Amino acid sequence: MRKRFNVDGLCYPDEHYMVNINDRLEQIQTLIDDGKYFVINRARQYGKKTTLHMLAQKFSSEYQIFSISFEGLGNSSYKDEWSFCRKVYGLLYDVIYYEETSEVSDEIRTECYRMSLNDARPDFRTLSNFFSLICKESGKPVVFIIDEVDQAADQESFLDFLGMLRDKYMKRRSRPTFRSVILAGVYDIKNLKLKIRKGQESLYNSPWNIAAKFMVDMSFSPKDIAGMLTEYKDDINVAMDIDAIAQLIYDYTGGYPFLVSRICQLTEEAAAESSMQSVSAAPRLNEASGSRCYKWNKSDILDAVKQLLNEQNTLFDDMGKKLSDSKELDNIIRLILFNGKKIPYSPDEYAINLGVMFGYLKNEDGLVAVSNRIFETRLYNRYLSENITENKLADTASLGRNQFITDGILNMDLVMEKFMIHFTDIYGDSESSFLEEHGRRIFLIYLKQIINGVGNYYIEALATLNKHNLT
């Protein structure tokens, strides 16, 4: 079975085309060796699970690793201290039973199983002593990993559990405990506390203030993407300018792992489908090797971008939900996109911090910006579609769209000329405040109807509306 590009769940090096993350793993190992407790909080589908899995695989000979996940735990697991501790015992026993860790004595195995049973009543002190026993008996430093901590975001028992881990960290010089504890999820633990506490005075009173800052860059650089494409090119005999294609993918994705892999996946699928449906599009002969090969070029990547922007997936669905849940974040993005507002970047501003944490916003030269072209265009499409059915200008653009595009080139001068005529007819009597607030949005609705289905667009600044080429 040959390798594939993958966007669903874990990636395995022997099954999937992947970016080489050894340098990230070594940076994480440094944190572990230094005895740090930390949180890998990154946006959805940012490679957290794969990183944790490869971390456990790569360093299992140096550390005894217990890796559990709170994904899928029901509310009954958090209803009281006993229920929560029983569940943690159960998750630990699964790790032992399936031999995902080594060097576990019969005493620990038996005790772990006994405390996971429904009639057991373990509390946090019992669990803390059990952790100490594991660490005391282990011949290697013990690392404790908890994935999907967001699943416990609204549960007081989880924060009490963090408090117990903090207490063990503070007493690490006198009592056996973990070398390192790694939590993983979208939210920082400080934000988990914020979601639970209702009183403003305790919003940031997190028991996880012992955590070291996690500074590892998990996005993909053009060099990272090029390395993955090189492996693919060698395996499949694809003809492409690797550096140029890698840079183009990066330009649209900002190195967001899911977006990078999805564009590659869509490009590969389209090439395979095209070769099967059309003789003329079948793989051509590679003159150097004499074998048959595909070819990737700029238009293939842009077609994949267009397809990605038009599909429903869990990442975009989650984006819509997050924006619906946070009106402050939604308003900031609207101001940036449609008003061109320059908002100073401040990590202390809750809505900005939330947008960065979700992967939608970034700090660009001290100002808040949308993190990549894919997200920016998807957000434009989302907002522009809200009232498009009621917009008369959109109708006029749709009816006359053929006159604006010749051989893939957008006649921007004609677009502006016709727009001003129609805009004056429809909105000429509007107040200046309306025009200032909504003018850019109205123009983008007009422009979108013209290029819809013909090309892609992205907007770097208001001045870029003068560009003539469709991409």
Feature roles, as predicted:
Residues 446-471:
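Active-site metal-binding core of divalent-cation-utilizing nuclease and nuclease-like domains
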Residues 221-278, 290-358, 364-365, 393-402:
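Winged-helix-like regulatory helical subdomains adjacent to P-loop NTPase cores
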Residues 1-20, 109-112, 206-210, 398-402, ...:
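Conserved adenine-nucleotide phosphate-binding loops and their immediately adjacent elements
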Residues 376-404:
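Short, amphipathic alpha-helical interaction segments positioned at domain boundaries
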Residues 117-188, 196-202:
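Conserved Walker B catalytic segment
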Residues 66, 78-104:
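Conserved NTP-binding/hydrolysis module of P-loop NTPases
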Residues 60-75:
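Conserved catalytic segments around the Walker B and adjacent sensor/switch elements
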Residues 1-59, 129-133:
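Walker A/P-loop-proximal flanking segment of P-loop NTPase domains
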